[in-house]
Amino acid sequence: MPKIKTHRGAAKRFRKTGTGKIKRNHAFTSHILTSKTRKNKRNLRKGAIVAAVDHKNIAKLIPYM
């Protein structure tokens, strides 16, 4: 059986934590930032955990991470 290929786009966007959860970055941080509040932009810098409903599909894309 051949090895499963890692989805390169997903590998650049997601990281696994030590406990097996998958971390992601927030969207809406690249442009049109003048209309967003300071607090909103600050909170968008923080990482987030992938939702439970998406976890299985994303884990398939990054099997060896």
Curated annotation (Swiss-Prot):
GO terms for biological process: translation. GO terms for cellular component: ribonucleoprotein complex; ribosome. Keywords: Ribonucleoprotein, Ribosomal protein. Gene3D superfamilies: 4.10.410.60. InterPro entries: Ribosomal_bL35, Ribosomal_bL35-like, Ribosomal_bL35_CS, Ribosomal_bL35_sf. One of its GO terms (molecular function) is structural constituent of ribosome. The keyword DNA-binding does not apply. Belongs to the bacterial ribosomal protein bL35 family. This is Large ribosomal subunit protein bL35. It comes from Geotalea uraniireducens (strain Rf4) (Geobacter uraniireducens).
